[in-house]
């Protein structure tokens, strides 16, 4: 069984990013700049944002955080995004999700300049991904998963891929990446899928992203499958995934741990996207 170590690969990617930024700044170019917007005081979101700010600093990306009150209006938030869209010194914009219930999340995402959309959530970037365009900014978690598979020489050509979870953040874009260039046969499962086990047992590559601890058990995975666990759940004070890791690993060819698998890759690809957006602007100068 191969343990897909996202933590070590993420460090490798971050080191490469740091080296590239160091080379650019030594030539007189400014640092890349990422604006991070957090609305409210959700403890988990605060942890994620602070981690992103810390990781930005570690590679030489300048972060420009905005910590906004829970009761900010839709109009006020849109005005801030408009200002950041027009700021030539800002390369990337990230709005930490989830947003408070009174904020229209889709409208906020659509307000971000698609060329500054480091999360890859804007409909233009999603459309580019869906149509196979190579200039799409890719969502960080699915992109990180593809990088992880590539690092371990796991090819998905001709494979049966099953994605459990149909969110806009992971499930849907993940499916589109596997479909790109007609490489894989992809099945998406969701809350209305009948007999989930019958689908997961067919998977050469199984990606699970639903937020239900140990949803996927050993009897739901075929021998020799590659299992990617995106879930992050807190159970009895411990972080666990959506897969029953200890039992499923007995059957898997390769599997991601939780923590230390997909999570670090998501942050690494956020930094990667920020650098790529910055470099695109340099080419235009």
UniProtKB/Swiss-Prot annotation:
Q: Which reaction does it catalyse?
A: (6R)-5,10-methylene-5,6,7,8-tetrahydrofolate + NADP(+) = (6R)-5,10-methenyltetrahydrofolate + NADPH; (6R)-5,10-methenyltetrahydrofolate + H2O = (6R)-10-formyltetrahydrofolate + H(+)
Q: Please describe what this protein does.
A: Catalyzes the oxidation of 5,10-methylenetetrahydrofolate to 5,10-methenyltetrahydrofolate and then the hydrolysis of 5,10-methenyltetrahydrofolate to 10-formyltetrahydrofolate.
Q: Which InterPro entries does this one have?
A: Aminoacid_DH-like_N_sf (IPR046346), NAD(P)-bd_dom_sf (IPR036291), THF_DH/CycHdrlase (IPR000672), THF_DH/CycHdrlase_cat_dom (IPR020630), THF_DH/CycHdrlase_CS (IPR020867), THF_DH/CycHdrlase_NAD-bd_dom (IPR020631)
Against CDD domains, the record matches this protein to:
NAD_bind_m-THF_DH_Cyclohyd
Q: What gene is it encoded by?
A: folD
Superkingdom in the source lineage: Bacteria
SUPFAM superfamilies (alphabetical) = Aminoacid dehydrogenase-like, N-terminal domain, NAD(P)-binding Rossmann-fold domains
Cited Pfam families: THF_DHG_CYH, THF_DHG_CYH_C
Which Gene Ontology BP terms does the record give?
L-histidine biosynthetic process; methionine biosynthetic process; purine nucleotide biosynthetic process; tetrahydrofolate interconversion
Q: How does it assemble?
A: Homodimer.
Q: Which GO terms describe its cellular component?
A: cytosol
Record's protein name: Bifunctional protein FolD
Native source species: Sulfurihydrogenibium sp. (strain YO3AOP1)
Enzyme nomenclature, EC number: 1.5.1.5, 3.5.4.9
């Amino acid at each position: 069984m191969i343990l897909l170590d996202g933590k070590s690969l993420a460090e490798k990617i971050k080191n490469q990013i740091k080296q590239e930024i160091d080379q650019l700044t030594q030539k007189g170019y400014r640092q890349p700049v990422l604006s991070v917007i957090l609305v409210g005081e959700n403890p988990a979101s605060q942890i994620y944002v602070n981690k992103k700010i810390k990781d930005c600093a570690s590679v030489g990306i300048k972060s420009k955080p905005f910590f906004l009150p829970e009761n900010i209006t839709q109009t006020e938030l849109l005005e801030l995004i408009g200002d950041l869209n027009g700021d030539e010194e800002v390369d990337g914009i990230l709005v930490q999700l989830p947003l408070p219930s009174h904020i229209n999340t889709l409208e906020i995402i659509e307000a971000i300049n698609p060329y500054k959309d480091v999360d890859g959530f804007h409909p233009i970037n999603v459309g580019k991904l869906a149509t196979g365009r190579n200039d799409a900014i890719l969502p960080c978690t699915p992109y990180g998963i593809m990088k992880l598979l590539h690092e371990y020489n796991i090819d998905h050509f001709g494979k049966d891929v099953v994605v459990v979870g149909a969110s806009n953040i992971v499930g849907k874009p993940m499916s589109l990446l596997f479909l790109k260039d007609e490489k894989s046969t992809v099945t998406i499962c969701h809350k209305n899928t009948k007999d989930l086990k019958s689908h997961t047992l067919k998977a050469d590559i199984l990606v699970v992203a639903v937020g239900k601890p140990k949803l996927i058990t050993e009897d739901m995975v075929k021998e020799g499958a590659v299992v990617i666990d995106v879930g992050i759940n807190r159970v009895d004070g411990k972080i666990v995934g959506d897969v029953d890791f200890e039992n499923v690993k007995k059957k898997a060819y390769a599997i991601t741990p939780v923590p230390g698998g997909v999570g670090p890759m998501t942050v690494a690809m956020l930094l990667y996207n920020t650098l790529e957006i910055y470099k695109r602007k340099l080419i235009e100068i």
